[in-house]
Amino acid sequence: EGGCQVILFQGRVYDTMLQGELLGQLEARINDTRQGRGLEQEKVIRGLVRLGQELREELENAARGKTAREAGNPWIPAWLGYLTRFLSREWLEYKIETELGVKAGKGRKSEPGGSTECGPGPSHEVYHYTELQKMETHILPLGTLLHITAGNMEGLPVFSIVEGLLTGNVNILKLPGNDGGLSLDIILRLIRLEPALADYIYVFDTSSGDLPAMRRMEEMADGIVVWGGDSAMAAVRRSAPPGTRLIEWG
């Protein structure tokens, strides 16, 4: 597989020649992050909104007749326009409320007592009965997510990382082979706008055929987010360690 041939590790870019060394450090770095205070959802939203505004300005500059390079971005793929609409506070808060059932930044909801199953996704629910016999549900991050995205949908790695950040997870992204550096550029912009996110995003341009490296990443993950067809799903099911949650998107 081709690609940008770089690694993003705690906000800094490294050559893939250092992959083994960095993977050796990764679990300890993730554990340090997870033992901290956790990722504030408002910081995530604020960073994403700023990113959307910056990208929107570039699109507007291009629309006024400037070239993409003059606007500060040598590429403006079609999906970037959708991304700018996606990265608005209204849309992000709506997404959090409809998919998690909580107000943005609250991280909890209440509903009548009884059993409720948690569906698949990059978070999980912990239930506590209150004295009023209502069930208070705390939405907690799953922990560490490994994102394996398909190469036939431009921008998919960015959208997958956004999902993981909104639920407070540490995210390891395995880039698709034909990404060409587009996703990394967007993610670097996001970290520049909100530096607190650097400890929650790791990007590896690793070949799917590098089984030892893939296995090491899978072993660090509490959940694996898989975007792809049946063969991709089956391959991850075979290699995922027992107990790892698989979050499958076709």
Segments predicted by a language model, with ranges:
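N-terminal Rossmann-like NAD(P)+-binding subdomain of aldehyde/semialdehyde dehydrogenases
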Residues: 1-137
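Residue-level signal for inorganic ion chemistry
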Residues: 44, 168, 224
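Short, contiguous clusters of charged residues that form electrostatic/catalytic patches at enzyme active sites
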Residues: 46, 127-128, 159, 231-234
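Alpha-helical scaffold segments in soluble metabolic enzymes
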Residues: 50, 185, 189, 235
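Membrane helical hairpin/interfacial module
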Residues: 72, 76-77, 81, 172-177, ...
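Conserved small-residue-rich beta-alpha loop and adjacent elements
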Residues: 127-191
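Conserved NAD(P)+-binding/catalytic subdomain of aldehyde/semialdehyde dehydrogenases
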Residues: 197-250
